[in-house]
Curated annotation (Swiss-Prot):
Keywords: Ribonucleoprotein, Ribosomal protein, RNA-binding, rRNA-binding. It comes from the Bacteria. Disulfide bonds: none annotated. GO terms for cellular component: cytosolic large ribosomal subunit. PANTHER family: 60S/50S RIBOSOMAL PROTEIN L6/L9, LARGE RIBOSOMAL SUBUNIT PROTEIN UL6M. PROSITE patterns: RIBOSOMAL_L6_1 (PS00525). This is Large ribosomal subunit protein uL6. It comes from Picosynechococcus sp. (strain ATCC 27264 / PCC 7002 / PR-6). The lineage of its organism: Bacteria, Bacillati, Cyanobacteriota, Cyanophyceae, Oscillatoriophycideae. Coiled coil: none annotated. Part of the 50S ribosomal subunit. HAMAP family: Ribosomal_uL6_B. GO terms for biological process: cytoplasmic translation.
Amino acid sequence: MSRIGKKPIPIPDKVTVTLNGANVAVKGPKGSLERTLPEKVTVTQEDNTIVVSPVDNSRTARERHGLCRTLVANMIEGVSQGYSKQLEIIGVGYRAQVQGNKLTLNVGYSKPVEMQMPEGVTAAMGEKNTQVIISGIDKEVVGNTAAKVRAVRPPEPYKGKGIRYQGEYIRRKAGKAGKK
């Protein structure tokens, strides 16, 4: 059995969980999420906790046990607290703007790069116009959106210019050695 999968998931106040076979629906103060879990795993609700258990002892059931427990736990945390990723834009003249549901990046290309935020995800500016905060209730969508924004101009190893996650360490390389 999975060490992670064995742990019961506590349900906080103001969060309701509806189980319908393999479908799990979670409602909370920030919104609601639905997900269909893979086969070979059963989800049961006992008092104020949710328990995920494998159907049998097969390899696929054991593989999916911890996965399903983490997916449900992420849904509960998302509707109660939400998720956010912070990105830093480093480079001379590099900046970002948020207009409604659209993020515009000026990162050294001839034209600005415009990105439409998916449903349920919001982009906001940090203290400076070189910080972008991407937030939402679905951890997977927030992470994918942040990765797509970072992929527009990933940090390069020589000068460190580009878009990076806040606190991300970039391995730097030495430049070409000059001629003697």
